[in-house]
């Protein structure tokens, strides 16, 4: 089942990611100890494509909670 952008943002925040910058609907997140950035695009009510969700979770080093 696809996830909403808001649910992904909650997962990132729970793991310690913080928003570093925004341009339009693209939010970029950084982590104090993990390397790299994670970009999440779309409005909070939008549904993410399954491959986009997989990519975001892989970049963040998280497992799919479902």
Residue ranges and their predicted role:
Residues 1-16:
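Polyanion-binding surface elements
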Residues 4, 21, 48-49:
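Secondary-structure boundary/capping motif
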Residues 16-21, 64:
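Short secondary-structure junctions
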Residues 29-33:
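Active-site beta-strand termini and strand-to-loop segments that position acidic
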Residues 35-37, 41-66:
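C-terminal structural segments of small proteins and small subunits
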């Amino acid at each position: 089942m696809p996830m909403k952008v808001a649910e992904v943002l909650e997962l990132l925040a729970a793991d310690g990611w913080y928003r570093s910058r925004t341009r339009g609907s693209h939010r970029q997140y950084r982590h104090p100890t993990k390397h790299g950035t994670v970009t999440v695009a779309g409005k909070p009510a939008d549904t993410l494509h399954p491959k986009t969700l997989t990519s975001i979770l892989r970049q963040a080093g998280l497992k799919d909670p479902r």
